[in-house]
């Protein structure tokens, strides 16, 4: 027994010692090492969270004129709380209209009916028959069908009981439930100071209502070039997954089109970051930072001049005969040897009760192709030289070509005997037809069948593609089309191809073509982004982050003497040929005019079936050491199916006036 008692005492002693040790450790944790363990707990429970979207980068033109800035917008928003019911949201809406001024006239009848439905479920249910409910069980009707039936059976008399206050609450309820349930709902932007302050100070007891400062874009030159600058907005539903993968939140504002979209990664701001600690406090670890600023190659004042000239000349042309289908013109001005776009404009005019009104359609310079006509004869001539179908200075007779069962194919006017330079100057179709037949290894005889080697199409298209025709120019914008590339390889179509009457090209493709000629065969990527600057907290530009260097896509595969000969031909166009005075006071210009048969969708039925005549012009100046290239295209300048022979020179006038204006602004010393 004494042994057992001794053991018990020993065990008791050990237990007491253990309790003392445990107690001492608790004292150390609670008093001596308290801060240490709090830090450990915080590190295990802290979460990094981001603040609201930061402002986007600013956009400038090449002369550092500010084009796009940010404007702070005070916003009231609603975030649905967990387990809130429709009835509770209705009550919340009635409460909040006391503090938020909303325009209930924007409320649609459908929205008001949905509000009535939430408040009168029993009555609405009674308006659905047993037979209709049975159809749901039989899967002849869906629950959505039943909801629509309920809505349809709400009468104007039901709604007439609603007061102005009820309608305000109904409109707020609609805003609270628009879109996905998990999304923040913008209730009001540009909130008043009183509204913003009240909700900011009381957000903890307003059931999901809160405030924030967001940013909207401010365009300092109005609509000038705005369509290319692009839009910003909420993430499109179809791109939700892609943006989430890139660490965006669904409430973020992103670039949706053109420059804003193309350079989203540069322009987007960096959100502030906070550590959310275990005690629900926030500690800022990095501040919000505006996105990088970008400088474009565009000269905004030149752009304004171009827009105004096109508008004026299009409206003038509509007073001329036979311009029924004329309603748009495109212009692109580039800088040779770099590819920079100095101005790019598309203008569309429509008639209204007060006359004509113009619209900006500049994005269509990348997607609206047309048959360019004779402007491509420089590339066609090069095919002839490269394949040895002709020699420099070769003389032939301008005479109509006749293929069996086909109409005669002639030049617009016969010149008689002519060489390659005169052929370009006078825009001889026949000269090109004869080259095409030689390239196609044809044995031509008047009014007999024409057989060609179809590989001739590939030979032509390869050379054309080296100028940017029939391929993407790789301009730094999200959308660009190739134009139409004909699949039929009939012999007469090869002849048509050689004079720009088969495949179609966009204005930007034609601009790359003439810029390649002006740059001695160097095909450059056309671009709008010129420089990127780090953001600052002032109105001044920050540190230069990087500058865009010209990108050479390829060189035209030809001999220097051949390209030089084409350039001489383009110079002759402007001195002795059909292009005299088309570039006005531009010094020593070179270029090429073009007229084509083209087809348009005149009645907007989706079918391109109305024959018209279109005009194009491409040029550059000065001939030696060019500083600019210009491309002007005007579809539908003439209706050929009338008894009126008048043809408007609107395309030439636009080219002349813009070229003159350019060199007035930027004279050559």
Where are these regions (language model features)?
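Membrane-proximal periplasmic segments of bacterial cell-envelope enzymes
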Residues: 1-261, 265-286, 329-330, 336, ...
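Short, basic/aromatic recognition patches
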Residues: 39-51, 302-324
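Beta-lactam-recognizing serine transpeptidase/beta-lactamase-like catalytic domain environment
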Residues: 66-69, 74, 273-289, 298, ...
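Solvent-exposed, polar/charged alpha-helical surfaces in well-ordered, non-transmembrane soluble domains
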Residues: 90-94, 98, 197, 201, ...
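Short conserved micro-motifs at the rims of enzyme active sites and ligand-binding pockets
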Residues: 239-241, 600-604, 631, 640-644
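Structural motif corresponding to the C-terminal cap of alpha-helices
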Residues: 309-318, 349, 443, 574, ...
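Short, gly/Ser/Thr-rich active-site loops of penicillin-recognizing serine hydrolases
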Residues: 539, 649-669
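A short acidic/glycine-rich loop-to-helix N-cap element
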Residues: 636-651
């Amino acid at each position: 027994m004494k042994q057992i008692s001794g053991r018990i005492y020993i065990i008791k002693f050990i237990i007491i010692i253990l309790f003392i040790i445990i107690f001492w450790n608790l004292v150390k944790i609670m008093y001596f090492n308290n801060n240490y363990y709090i830090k450990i707990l915080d590190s295990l429970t802290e979460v990094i969270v981001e603040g609201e979207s930061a402002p986007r980068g600013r956009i400038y033109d090449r002369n550092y004129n500010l084009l796009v800035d940010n404007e702070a917008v005070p916003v009231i928003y609603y975030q649905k709380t967990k387990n809130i019911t429709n009835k509770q949201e209705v009550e919340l809406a009635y409460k909040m209209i006391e503090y938020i001024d909303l325009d209930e006239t924007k409320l649609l009848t459908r929205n008001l009916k949905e509000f009535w439905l939430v408040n009168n479920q029993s009555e609405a249910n009674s308006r659905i028959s047993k037979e209709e409910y049975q159809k749901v069980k039989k899967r002849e009707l869906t629950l959505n069908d039943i909801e629509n039936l309920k809505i349809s059976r709400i009468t104007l008399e039901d709604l007439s009981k609603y007061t102005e206050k009820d309608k305000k609450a109904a409109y707020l309820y609609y805003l609270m439930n628009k879109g996905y349930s998990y999304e923040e709902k913008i209730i009001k932007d540009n909130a008043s100071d009183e509204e913003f302050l009240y909700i900011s100070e009381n957000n903890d007891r307003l059931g999901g209502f809160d405030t924030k400062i967001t940013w909207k874009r401010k365009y300092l030159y109005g609509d000038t070039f705005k369509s290319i600058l692009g839009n910003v907005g909420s993430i499109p539903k179809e791109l939700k997954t892609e943006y989430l993968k890139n660490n965006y939140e669904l409430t973020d504002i992103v670039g949706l089109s053109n420059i804003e979209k193309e350079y989203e990664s540069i322009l987007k701001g960096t959100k502030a970051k906070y550590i959310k600690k275990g005690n629900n406090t926030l500690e800022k670890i990095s501040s919000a930072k505006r996105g990088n600023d970008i400088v474009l190659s565009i000269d905004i004042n030149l752009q304004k001049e171009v827009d105004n000239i096109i508008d004026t000349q299009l409206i003038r042309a509509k007073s001329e005969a036979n311009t029924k289908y004329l309603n748009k013109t495109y212009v692109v001005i580039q800088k040779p040897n770099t590819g920079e776009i100095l101005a790019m404009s598309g203008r569309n005019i429509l008639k209204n009760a007060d006359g004509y009104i113009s619209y900006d359609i500049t994005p269509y310079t990348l997607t609206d192709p047309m048959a360019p006509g004779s402007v491509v004869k420089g590339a066609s001539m090069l095919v002839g030289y490269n394949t040895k179908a002709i020699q420099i200075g070769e003389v032939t007779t301008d005479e109509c070509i006749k293929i069996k069962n086909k109409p005669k194919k002639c030049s617009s006017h016969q010149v008689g005997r002519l060489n390659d330079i005169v052929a370009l100057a006078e825009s001889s179709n026949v000269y090109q037809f004869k080259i095409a037949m030689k390239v196609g290894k044809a044995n031509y005889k008047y009014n007999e069948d024409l057989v060609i080697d179809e590989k001739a199409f590939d030979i032509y298209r390869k050379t054309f593609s080296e100028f940017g025709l029939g391929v993407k120019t790789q301009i730094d914008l999200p959308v660009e089309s190739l134009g139409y590339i004909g699949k039929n390889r009939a012999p007469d179509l090869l002849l048509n191809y050689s004079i720009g009457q088969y495949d179609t090209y966009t204005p930007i493709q034609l601009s790359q073509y003439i810029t390649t000629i002006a740059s001695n065969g160097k095909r450059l990527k056309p671009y709008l982004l010129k420089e990127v600057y780090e953001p600052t907290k002032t109105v001044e530009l920050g540190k230069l982050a990087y500058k865009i260097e010209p990108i050479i896509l390829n060189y035209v595969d030809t001999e220097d003497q051949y390209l030089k000969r084409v350039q001489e031909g383009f110079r002759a166009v402007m001195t002795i040929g059909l292009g005299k005075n088309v570039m006005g006071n531009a010094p020593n210009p070179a270029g090429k005019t073009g007229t084509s048969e083209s087809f348009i969708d005149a009645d907007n039925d989706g079918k391109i079936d109305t024959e018209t005549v279109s005009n194009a012009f491409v040029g550059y100046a000065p001939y030696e050491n060019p500083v600019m290239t210009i491309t002007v295209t005007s579809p539908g300048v003439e209706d050929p199916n009338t008894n009126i022979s008048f043809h408007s020179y609107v395309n030439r006038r636009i080219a002349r006036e813009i070229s003159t204006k350019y060199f007035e602004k930027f004279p050559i010393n």
